[in-house]
Amino acid sequence: MRRSAVAVLAAGLFLTGAGSAVADAWHTMPKLRSEGVVLKNGKYTMYPKFTKHGGFGFKVDLQDDNAADGHNVYVQARVEGYSWRRFNGQQRKTVRIQKEVYDGAALYVSNAWIRACRDRGSLRPDNCTRTLHHKR
């Protein structure tokens, strides 16, 4: 009796772990480009409940596509109900950015958005790529 209970418990834990691994799978993002900025080699995931706040995780290469213009580049990401969070890149370089964005009041998020922009200063508006929308 005791051995069968342990076997059932072990099988249940294994299947729970396998289910979490599938929910935590990374998906490919399309390459995004706008004047002066490129977001490439992107992957994203929607974390399951109780894992990294159930948030939206992403890892991308952010490239300053026009080194001569003197402008910085950045990634913006947000989840439902919250404003954009900004993650800066570097001028004249390609940097790897890996972050999580989440709603601290919820077990998990269902919708997330991401885009890349070029910071053109305070007098001119920034130009951004199209916004990608990801759903759980």
Where are these regions (language model features)?
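Secretory targeting and sorting signals
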Residues: 1-23
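Post-signal peptide N-terminal regions of Sec-secreted extracellular proteins
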Residues: 24-136
